[in-house]
Amino acid sequence: MKNLKKKLTLTGLMTAGLLFLSGCVQTHVVDGVRVPTEAATHGITYNFLVRPMSAFVDLFANNLHMGYGWGIIFVTLIIRFLILPLGLNQAYKSTYMQEKMAYLAPVFAPLQERLKKAQTPEEKMAAQQALMAAQKDNGINMLSSIGCLPMLIQWPFFIALYNAAAYTTGISSSTFYGIPLGHPSVVLVIISGVLYFIQTWISTLSMTPEQKKSGMAMLIMSPAMIVVFSFMSPAGVALYWAVGGFVIVIQQIIITFIMKPRMRRRIDEEFTKNPPKINNEGLKDVTPTSVQENFKEITSERNEKERKSGGRNAGKQNRK
C-alpha cells in the first residue's frame, strides 16, 4: 500500500509538472496549428519568458541560417548548461541527505522497530519523538534538502524553453532531417524515452538495495511520462525533451560517479570523528540489539570491506 501511494504521488507530481509547463500559455487551434491565444500573447508569461526565448531560437534558425531544428537544439543546450550548476546544487543537497539517511539506517533501525512495536499511543508518541530527536541530533533534516530556490530559478527557463519549442512562429512548418517539427515524431519520442531511461538507470547504480526498491518506480515512470507527453506534442517539443534528456544524463553521471563517492567519504569521516548520538531514555526496550552495538557492527563491516579493497588495490599497484 505504501509503495502504491509513493508511485501515485510520484506520477501525480510528474504529471502536474508537465501540465504546468504546457499550461502556462493558453492556446487554441488556427488552421490546424495550435498557437497562443491573443490574450496569451499579451500576458506576462509570454512576453517576459516565451517571446525572448522564441527570439533566441529565431537567431539561430533565421539569422544564422541553421534552421529551427538546430535552433531548438542550440538554445536548449545553452540554457540547460547555464542552469546546470543550479541543478547540481539542488541534487547535491538532496542526495547528501539521502546518503546520510542510508548510512544511518542501521543505527535508526532499532528506534523504528520500537515505533512499530509500540502498543499504546503514549509509547508511539514517545518512540516517534525519540526517532525525530535522533535524526535532528545527527543532522538529518529532509526539508533543508529540498532546495526550493534552485528549483524556482530553473522553472522559468523550463517554461520558456518548452513554449518556445512549441509555439515559435515557423517551427510548425519546418522540418529537421525530414522530420516535420509541427507533428508528432515517433523517432524523437523513442530517443527522448531512451535518454530519460538511461538517466534513471544510472541513478540506480549507486543506490542501496532499500533505495532501489523505491527507485525502480522512477526507472519506469520518468521515461514513460516523457514518452506519453512527447507523443502528444509536436516534434519540436520532443526535440526539446531529447536534448534536455542528454543534458540530464550528463548531470546524472556527475552525481553518480563524482558527487556520491565524495559524499560517502565525507559522511564516513563525519561519523568516524563524531559517532551517532542516540538517546534511549524513556523508551520501552523491545529490541535485543542496542543502537550503539548496531552502529559498531555496521561500521566494522564497512571498515573490513575498505581494508580488503585497499589491500587488493595496493597489490595491483605493487605489481605495476
Swiss-Prot record:
GO terms for biological process: protein insertion into membrane; protein transport. GO terms for molecular function: membrane insertase activity. It is a multi-pass membrane protein. One of its GO terms (cellular component) is plasma membrane. The chain crosses the membrane at residues 68-88, 142-162, 178-198, 217-237, 239-259. Residues 1-23 form the signal peptide. A lipid is attached at C24 (S-diacylglycerol cysteine). The keyword Cell membrane applies. InterPro entries: YidC/ALB3/OXA1/COX18, YidC/Oxa/ALB_C, YidC/YidC1/YidC2_Firmicutes, YidC_ALB_C. CDD domains: 5TM_YidC_Alb3 (cd20070). The keyword Cytoplasm does not apply. It is found in: Cell membrane. A lipid is attached at C24 (N-palmitoyl cysteine). Residues 294-309 have a biased composition (Basic and acidic residues). Residues 270-320 are annotated as: Disordered. Keywords: Cell membrane, Chaperone, Lipoprotein, Membrane, Palmitate, Protein transport, Signal, Transmembrane, Transmembrane helix, Transport. Its main location: membrane. PANTHER family: CYTOCHROME C OXIDASE ASSEMBLY PROTEIN COX18, MITOCHONDRIAL, OXA1. NCBIfam families: PRK02463.1, yidC_oxa1_cterm. Required for the insertion and/or proper folding and/or complex formation of integral membrane proteins into the membrane. Involved in integration of membrane proteins that insert both dependently and independently of the Sec translocase complex, as well as at least some lipoproteins. Belongs to the OXA1/ALB3/YidC family. Type 2 subfamily. This is Membrane protein insertase YidC 2.
